């Protein structure tokens, strides 16, 4: 069976993934260095999303960032779309998460 994802599905999957990232950050706050390294590598301050994340990472505590990425409101959903947390989860973990999400939602 083919599972076509709409925007709500994509947002729910992103929230699920970010909750796992949040748990990892709580257990290992030093992983915030991954986000800082990604921002330095992406270095595009002319982009609004980059500026927003740069401000978030430089002005908020790890716990505040975690609370932000776990929120379910529209603003948090928008912010998660450009989150700099690539590399905190392994490619295998991301693949398994996506597969599990697809299987759970295809059955619904």
Task: Annotate each PLM feature.
Residues 2-108:
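Basic, alpha-helical nucleic-acid-binding regions used in initiation and control of genome expression
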């Amino acid at each position: 069976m083919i599972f076509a994802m709409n925007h709500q599905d994509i947002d729910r999957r992103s929230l699920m993934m970010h909750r796992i990232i949040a748990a990892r950050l709580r257990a290992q706050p030093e992983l915030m260095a991954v986000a800082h390294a990604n921002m330095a590598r992406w270095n595009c301050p002319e982009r609004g999303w980059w500026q927003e994340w740069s401000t978030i990472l430089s002005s908020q505590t790890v716990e505040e960032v975690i609370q932000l990425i776990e929120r379910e409101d529209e603003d948090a959903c928008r912010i998660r779309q450009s989150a700099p947390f690539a590399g905190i989860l392994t490619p295998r973990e991301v693949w398994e998460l996506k597969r599990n999400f697809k299987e759970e939602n295809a059955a619904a």
